A protein has these predicted regions:
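Short alpha-helical "recognition helix" segments of helix-turn-helix
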Residues: 32-33, 61
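Helix-turn-helix DNA-binding elements, focusing on the entry/boundary residues of the two helices
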Residues: 18, 29, 55-58, 69
Length: 77
């Protein structure tokens, strides 16, 4: 029996913000993963909140998407 992933609500907020930024720019998730230099599976886990994005991943997402880290973490506090 496969274990269900535990969703971290804080990670989910960041994932939704990254997803929204990518969609607004018309990016595909494979393209975003490639430009961030991460595996698609890793990006998917970050976007769904299954895993908390690393600080380095957050910086990369911010740079690649041209969006501030503040915008990507909006709603955490």
């Amino acid at each position: 029996m496969k274990n269900k992933a535990v969703i971290n609500p804080l990670a989910q907020i960041v994932g939704k913000n990254i997803t929204a930024a990518a969609v607004d720019l018309g990016w595909t998730f494979p393209q975003l993963a490639k430009d961030m230099d991460v595996r698609e599976e890793t990006l998917q886990r970050w976007l769904t909140g299954e895993r908390m994005i690393t600080v380095f991943g957050l910086v990369r997402a911010s740079r690649v998407l041209g969006v501030s880290m503040e915008a990507l973490t909006k709603g955490l506090l």
